[in-house]
Structures are given as structure tokens and as C-alpha cells.
């Protein structure tokens, strides 16, 4: 099993009052990928980090193998969710796989 962690910050143009709705949509759609993407076992979405954090939101996933990370990254369902609910609103992506 491997973990794939991705963290982002919201773009400056995103209004504070819009962030809760965006976080909810991200979480719902990212969690819905379990069962659709081969090798993707679990999805946790961190929407409320403590104030010492350097990023606004995080995605913590567990996959069966390291090779499944590449499958996940290119899977059409993941790309659709990322392009619709995540990428338009975020910047400063950081990733750690282990």
C-alpha cells in the first residue's frame, strides 16, 4: 500500500464566502472516485487544517501499489473531477508519495 498526499492553497481571487462550498464539492467528488479508479482504496479530504498549516486543503489517498498512482493521475474520472472541482480554484500544489 502507498499513500499519495496532495496539498493546495486557494487562488487569491477565491472569495472567503465561496470556500466552504468549494471544499464541500471537492470532498464529495474526490471521495466518489473510490470504486471508480482501479487501485484507489481510500480518500480523505482535509478541509479545516489548524492555523500552523501552510496549505488550505489536502487530499490523502491510499492506493494498492506505487504504479496505481500513475493510473489514478490519468484516469478519466479523476481528470474530470480535478479539472472541474479542483484545478480552477487552487495554486501551490505540493505532493508527497510514500
Which residues make up each language-model segment?
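Short S/T/G/P-rich N-terminal loop/turn motif that feeds into the first structured element of a domain
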Residues: 1-56, 64-74, 98
Amino acid at each position: 500500500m502507498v499513500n499519495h498526499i496532495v496539498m493546495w492553497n486557494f487562488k487569491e481571487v477565491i472569495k472567503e464566502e465561496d470556500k466552504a462550498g468549494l471544499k464541500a464539492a471537492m470532498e464529495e467528488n474526490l471521495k466518489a472516485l473510490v470504486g471508480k479508479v482501479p487501485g484507489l482504496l481510500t480518500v480523505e479530504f482535509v478541509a479545516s487544517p489548524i492555523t500552523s498549516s501552510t496549505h488550505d486543503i489536502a487530499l490523502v489517498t491510499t492506493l494498492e501499489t506505487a504504479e496505481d498512482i500513475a493510473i489514478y493521475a490519468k484516469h478519466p474520472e479523476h481528470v474530470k473531477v480535478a479539472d472541474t472541482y479542483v484545478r480552477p480554484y487552487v495554486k501551490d500544489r505540493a505532493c508527497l508519495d510514500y
